[in-house]
């Protein structure tokens, strides 16, 4: 579920975008490695590095959700909003864990 409030990652948005652009470069490099018939282990090493970098971005966004979105919902005193944000958090963590 999404809403129109400021996202929890707003303070680090530019840093996250920069990191995602670096990851994009890594993925393009992996594509070139395949095109150039590079050694399997070298390709897998780069895939692992890109995946780890992407997981770190995801964790930072998840942290922002907890420290801003969930915190604000709880602090508001609105039990329904707090329950909704908590449910969203649980679903996000479940999806994130499945990625691994």
Q: Where do the protein language model's features map onto the residues?
A:
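Solvent-exposed interaction patches of small proteins and small membrane subunits
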Residues: 1-100
């Amino acid at each position: 579920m999404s809403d129109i409030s400021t996202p929890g990652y707003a303070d680090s948005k530019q840093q996250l975008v920069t990191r995602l652009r670096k990851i994009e470069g890594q993925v393009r490099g992996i594509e070139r490695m395949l095109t150039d018939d590079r050694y399997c282990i070298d390709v897998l090493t780069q895939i692992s590095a890109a995946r780890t970098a992407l997981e770190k971005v995801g964790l930072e966004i998840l942290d922002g959700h907890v420290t801003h979105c969930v915190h604000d919902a709880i602090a508001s005193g609105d039990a329904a909003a707090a329950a909704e944000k908590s449910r969203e958090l649980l679903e996000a963590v479940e999806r994130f864990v499945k990625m691994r």
